[in-house]
Amino acid sequence: MPEKIILLYSGGLDTSVICRWLAEQGNHIVCFAANVGQREDWAALKKKALASGARKVVVADVRERFVGGFVFPAIRMNALYEGRYHLGTSLARPCIAEAMIEAARREKCGVFAHGATGKGNDQVRFELTAAALAPEMRVVAPWRDRAFFSAIKGRTEAIAYAKKHGIPVKATAGKPWSSDENILHISFEAGMLEDPAARPMDDMFELTADPRQAPDRPEKVTVDFTRGAPAALNGRKMSPARLLAEANRLAGRNGVGRVDMVESRYVGMKSRGVYETPGGTLLMAAHRDLEGLTMDRDVMNLRDSLIPRMAGIIYNGYWFSEEMAALMALVEESQRHVTGKVMLELYKGNVTVTGRTSPVSLYDPMVASMDDDKGAYDQALATGFIRLHGLPLRAQAKRAPKAKTLRK
């Protein structure tokens, strides 16, 4: 039976073919696209969606929501997946899906469709977001539909289908990799990058200068934070999206933010990804340093122990879970005093912190001084401190000969 379906639409070949395929079955298709900071000709995208069979096209500008509500919270967590990936795509998907669900309710669509493949993480992220926010919605995933992928096995068949149905196709060859962009990053995968030993081509990178060709002088930058969230760059207060865009510009021209890694996908396989995250790399380095000045050691250790878990939750698509809400509450409390300014230098792919200040610093220069501290710290008290903390070690040493005898 024909249905009213909202399709997560990127303007690319796959979602354009899916749009026509669903429309050919008599369905009423509303294409939804989200502006998360990617470089896109939105008028051309709307025109292509209509040419692909859509009855209506909805474009939502969610840049501020994305940065303020998803990217900055991840920076406050210091969330890196497997210690390296800044989660650019992982953070964007729940933001996009949330906005899509809002549009679906306005348009009275009870079904949503997406173009994510059955091998990737995005299918999980989109559908888990819908499960949390709109459990009543049904999903259509053509790349998991045998009728679809038996007819459209790959790019060659998709191009032929598009030409047959009058869908504009920019090129038939394309670059030897695929990419996904938002205001936080660009990710590259597939094609030549499926060989984990293959060096990325120099002309692949779009946001960052080649560190070898970056300026020969360090560029000084300051970042201000309020309760762990970036608030100003070089003394200028800006909205979250504008601040991240400016951080991208500064860090990118200095070659900062490239990562090439093999990661563990949620669906079980290993995957090679190359990422450019210039502004995010700069902001997280500054944030991490300011925590050293303002954050209690034990609170930091507790939060740090949860970073892999938080990053995994984001990567796997559980942003809107109760577990994530509980962890966000912990992060909120941990960031209560992370307010201040960090001074940095950007130079040929490197971010170097050169100083930091805070009105709520835990650092006491008199206590830490190696010179005359005017009685601020009584060094004689260290004797008892060390003796008490050494008690377990002395007990272990005393037991050692007995344990050795028992092992014989």
Model-derived features: where do they sit?
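Nucleotide-activated chemistry modules centered on ATP-dependent adenylation/adenylyltransferase
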Residues: P2-L8, L13-K408
